[in-house]
Amino acid sequence: MRHLESENGSIFQTALVFVRMNKPTIGRYKMKVSSKAIVNGEFEDKYGKRGNQFSPSGMPSYSIPFEIEDAPEGTKSFAVVLEDKDAISASGFVWTHWLISDLKRTSVAENESISATDFTQGANTWASALGKFEIEEASFYGGMAPPNNRHRYELIVYALDTVLDLPRGFRFNELYFAMQGHVLDSACVVGTYDMCGGVCLI
């Protein structure tokens, strides 16, 4: 794990650390994450814009389930990031759909985002200049809604040797820097979603 020396480090340094933090460790441990929301490589309709559960302002809110297996010894909590790097083609930046910190169990059921009280949720990218949602409404799962074509969504789980104690509504950068030096292992599962019922031309 590489640490940034200062917030004014070069773009290359920042990007390098970002990639390393988000690349699942291979061979060191055997932690795995899986989700029954993914069927034949695609997230089911109900977890995004083709579903039928939304926040008051229209954000898809029916959250995905997932299970973690073989976490390393010494794990005190998990941090979870659901992100869409393909959003760069439409918005110019990675879109974060779900942020979780201080998860102390190895499974989360579907639609738990709206009711769970034993883990902390951060603000997703629906709370941004583009999304324009208030942080409170966006501090839950914000489902998939790719505007241009089929996107790939990565569910990344980090096993940590500490509890982060971040406040509700934390941002990705706060989670990212709080995890520095505490990641024991990571695991990732990928599924796709589109707005054309799986028959997109692209």
Tell where the protein language model's regions lie, with residue ranges.
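N-terminus-centered regions that define maturation/targeting leaders and the start
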Residues: 22-202
